[in-house]
């Protein structure tokens, strides 16, 4: 009997010990889901330009520049994204530097853009050959140096066949997502006879289709087209842009973010046919982001967009694009918000006219925003 009592007490003690180890709060603290959804945010800004007035404003002394105030209110948004992408509408040819019509910026300008949080440079635009073959090649050299030293990637321009294959499409992996970028331009202001350096061109649909197919073979989760296209200063996209967008979605592109018109154009989404390749049922299209920073003052050219493309993978492993976030920006010139170039989020500053040095710029921002943002979306 004593032995049975002893055994019973031992069993009870062991049971209490196990119960203590497996109490509900302990189980909760150790819980880990078998799968979790992944998310990725990619933000895009428009034309980063450098007119002569900007060069003069930023120059501190010979070889010394200060661009830092220009993105003071923007850089936190760039850094908050998992990946930030900008259209670099200038060359890095070395001194002397110049603005429109042949853009040649100091090397520090590209470094500053990267300092603000931009991770990928888009080089396919109409100004990339403004300084000829030598200017384009030196731009490539500087971008390669930044890639080696800082991990900054680039696409749209290549110096040889190997670089073309590596950057068209440009593929990167972040947060478990494999993303492919296909960047191309409608043309260039200068025509070159040499094969290299080569800019990706919109007219060569076979090469664009081949780039999309390479991206698919390489396992891209999402393919984004970044065309430099459209008519300058037009708020509505053209028929040619619409036809090209249809071609891109039919070829397998999942999202389209455009530049070049220097103004914000309408946004839409295109339904994908079941006969089309692709990973999402509807492809968002932003026809033009507008400028990012420039000295332009023509109607609508100071209003611009930052687009935040948010991508998610659900518990089943399926990719989806969340509603596109549009952040309206205003590029204030010297004498406006303050005595320098400043890119500001419009909604953060509406109702704060007392912060402005020049009231005309504030009124222009509010009027332009209300007029342009009113009817900028649609679906097909």
What is the predicted role of each segment?
Residues 1-22:
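Bacterial Sec-dependent N-terminal signal peptides
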Residues 21-380:
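Acidic, metal/ion-coordinating pockets
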């Amino acid at each position: 009997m004593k032995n049975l009592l002893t055994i019973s007490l031992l069993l009870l003690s062991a049971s209490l010990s196990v119960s203590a180890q497996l109490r509900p709060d302990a189980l909760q603290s150790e819980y880990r889901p078998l799968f979790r959804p992944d998310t990725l945010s990619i933000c895009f800004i428009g034309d980063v330009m450098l007119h002569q007035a900007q060069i003069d404003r930023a120059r501190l002394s010979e070889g010394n520049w200060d661009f830092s105030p220009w993105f003071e209110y923007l850089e936190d948004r760039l850094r908050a994204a998992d990946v930030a992408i900008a259209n670099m509408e200038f060359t890095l040819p070395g001194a002397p530097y110049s603005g429109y019509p042949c853009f040649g910026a100091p090397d520090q300008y590209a470094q500053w853009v990267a300092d603000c949080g931009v991770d990928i440079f888009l080089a396919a635009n109409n100004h990339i050959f403004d300084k000829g073959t030598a200017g384009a090649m030196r731009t490539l050299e500087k971008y390669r140096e930044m890639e080696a030293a800082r991990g900054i990637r680039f696409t749209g321009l290549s110096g040889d066949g190997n670089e073309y294959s590596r950057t068209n499409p440009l593929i990167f992996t972040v947060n478990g997502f494999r993303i492919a970028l296909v960047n191309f331009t409608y043309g260039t202001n200068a025509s070159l006879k040499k094969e290299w350096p080569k800019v990706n061109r919109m007219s060569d649909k076979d090469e664009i289709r081949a780039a999309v197919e390479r991206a698919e073979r390489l396992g891209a989760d999402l393919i984004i087209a970044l065309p430099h296209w459209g008519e300058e200063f037009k708020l509505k996209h053209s028929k040619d842009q619409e036809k090209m967008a249809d071609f891109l979605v039919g070829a397998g592109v999942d999202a389209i973010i455009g530049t070049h018109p220097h103004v914000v154009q309408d946004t839409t989404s295109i339904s994908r046919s079941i006969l089309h390749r692709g990973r999402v049922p509807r492809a968002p299209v932003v026809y033009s982001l507008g400028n990012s920073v420039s000295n332009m003052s023509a109607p609508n050219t100071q209003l611009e967009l930052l687009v935040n493309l948010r991508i998610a993978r659900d518990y089943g492993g399926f990719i989806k694009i969340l509603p596109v976030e549009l952040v309206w920006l205003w590029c204030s010139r010297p004498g406006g918000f303050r005595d320098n170039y400043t890119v500001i989020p419009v909604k953060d500053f509406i109702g704060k006219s007392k912060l402005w040095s020049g009231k005309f710029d504030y009124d222009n921002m509010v009027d332009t925003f209300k007029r342009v943002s009113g009817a900028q979306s649609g679906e097909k």
